[in-house]
Regions:
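Conserved N-proximal alpha/beta basic substrate-recognition cap immediately N-terminal to
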Residues: 1-38
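A near-ubiquitous, low-amplitude feature marking generic local secondary-structure context
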Residues: 2-10, 47-51, 72
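Generic detection of long, well-ordered alpha-helical segments
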Residues: 10-21, 61, 153, 157, ...
Length: 166
């Protein structure tokens, strides 16, 4: 759900926590139905795009109710220091890939339905439930030709070069 709220108001955090309770219950039911052994979690983020800002993971509704000042500040201003007035509460999807011994995710660019590029976003200190779009992230391009250069556990494609500094 999209929530119009001020994260600094305890009454608005209560509304978000209630939504989190409902969503986590629905997800737990689906996880059980599909024999998923992981515990569901949520992501609370700005509805106005993030660039990695204004995003936190939520494991329980109490995480929202008990947000400390630092996390409330993180969720109160977004891109260009504009106030965040709408937050999205959505299912968290853990990263399942590991590249160069780091948790990684594929980032794909598409144009008119065709994939035109992409890369791995990796982070040396984050877990599979963390947001990888954060300070310290590393980028690696997909292989263009031979898999001899691959350093990925993914057999379909891997890593050719470090593009973090390009």
């Amino acid at each position: 759900p999209v929530l119009e709220m001020d994260i600094n108001l305890s009454s608005d955090r209560q509304i978000a926590a209630d939504s989190a309770t409902d969503l986590l219950a629905k997800l737990a039911q689906k996880y059980k139905q599909h024999n998923i052994s992981d515990t569901p979690y949520l992501v609370l983020k700005s509805d106005n795009g993030t660039y990695g800002m204004g995003v936190i993971t939520v494991e329980t509704p109490d995480d929202i109710l008990n947000l400390n000042r630092k996390k409330r500040n993180k969720l109160s201003k977004g891109k260009a220091s504009l106030p965040i007035e709408k937050l999205i509460l959505q299912e968290g999807v853990p990263s399942v890939h590991s590249t160069n011994n780091m948790v990684s995710e594929e980032v794909l660019y598409q144009c008119n339905g065709a994939t035109v590029g992409g890369f791995f976003r990796m982070h040396p200190t984050k877990s599979k439930k963390d947001i990888l779009n954060a300070t310290g992230m590393v980028f690696k391009s997909f292989c263009n030709d031979s898999h001899a250069l691959c350093s990925s556990e993914i057999t379909a494609c891997g890593v050719a070069q470090d593009i973090s500094k390009t």
